[in-house]
A protein has these predicted regions:
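Hydrophobic alpha-helical segments at protein termini of multi-pass membrane proteins
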Residues: 2-119
């Protein structure tokens, strides 16, 4: 199955990366990870390790964390848009797997105070 091209702004064709299910999984896991990363700055027992997110937090405060997450999502969508099918599906699938690991680790850390990955 190929991606459906949709006419975009000024005649630019939009070619969303991956399948609809993969994109939904990406945005759900991305959202969970974004909330968890934001909570890392308000709980005393968890630390955000991503230096870009930490820098955005230092510059903009708590709103900087979702802003950093939005930048990450934008980068993933842009890269997926540039890749051809089926490589775009593989790329977004790999990102979904990474976010699955990150989100699971972060949620367990927030709920139990201990990281299952030992990070």
């Amino acid at each position: 199955m190929t991606n459906v091209r949709t006419p975009g702004i000024d005649g630019i064709d939009l070619d969303p990366p991956g399948s609809v299910g993969t994109r939904v999984a990406f945005f759900v896991l991305w959202g969970i990870d974004m909330v968890a990363a934001t909570l890392f700055f308000v709980v005393p027992y968890a630390t955000e390790l991503n230096p870009v997110t930490v820098r955005f937090y230092e510059l903009f405060g708590l709103p900087g964390v979702p802003l950093a997450a939005i930048c990450y999502a934008g980068a993933v969508v842009a890269i997926g848009h540039l890749l051809s099918d089926p490589i775009d599906r593989r790329f977004v699938g790999a990102v979904v797997f990474a976010y699955l690991v990150f989100a699971t680790n972060n949620v367990v850390l927030l709920l139990s105070g201990r990281s299952p990955l030992g990070v």
